[in-house]
Amino acid sequence: RSSINNFDLKYASDAIFGEYLLEEMPDYDGRLLPSREVFILFSTRLFTLLGCLPVNGFDRQLTTHELRYFQYQMAKSVLAGVDAWLIRRGLYVSSYKRRVDLFLRKNEVKPNIKSLVLWSLSMKLNPEPDLLTPIQVSIIYDEVNNFFIREMESGLSWHFKKPISEYSSLRYAILKNPYEVSKICYSSIFRSSSVYLNRYRLIMAQFLLASAWSIKGIDLDLVQK
């Protein structure tokens, strides 16, 4: 099927298990990636925001290993936002450098966003961590979190054809989407499994936690939901 994984496997990979294997795969068009790829990106990259730091990571000096992991996860989150923007416009390509170049050339971004995206590309390709203080960690996390949520909400609005700006609107969109509901029902009825239902619950819980963050303080009302 047409997906980011298959597109990248076809055009950004070496041959696996034989010289001609990739030639046997069908051609994919980056202009025609389905909108659900944005939802998949959103659901798989939420972890980069929630699993990037130890429990007290905002309050102490991180080790070199922790800084490397944190910054690499931040880079993945930003580049996922870039990918979501490109998919919406039929501009997705397999090269990280070309994706970033397209995003910056086709999009009017503020200088701080440009710097954030270029930093993310550098970190993705050469993951050598910068030495950061706890305050700097909080500032970077805040910038990345805001960028990721903004781009993903735009992409999800495009996918679900409904404005997505908060937990309740995403929950409503999922429950009204025939494809997502059919996956939940099929798994529950015919496989006696709640795996898909639990997966959606996890996505919603992660979205709530990510949305609750602010450098000024945590929104406790969202956390309690």
Language-model segments: residues:
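Extended ligand-binding clefts on enzyme/binding-domain cores
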Residues: 116
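Short, hydrophobic/amphipathic alpha-helical patches that form generic packing surfaces
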Residues: 76-87, 119-122, 199-217
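C-terminal amphipathic alpha-helical interaction region
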Residues: 168-205, 210-225
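Conserved NTP/Mg2+-binding pocket subregion across the NTase superfamily
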Residues: 1-112, 125-192
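Solvent-exposed interaction patches of small proteins and small membrane subunits
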Residues: 121-124, 225
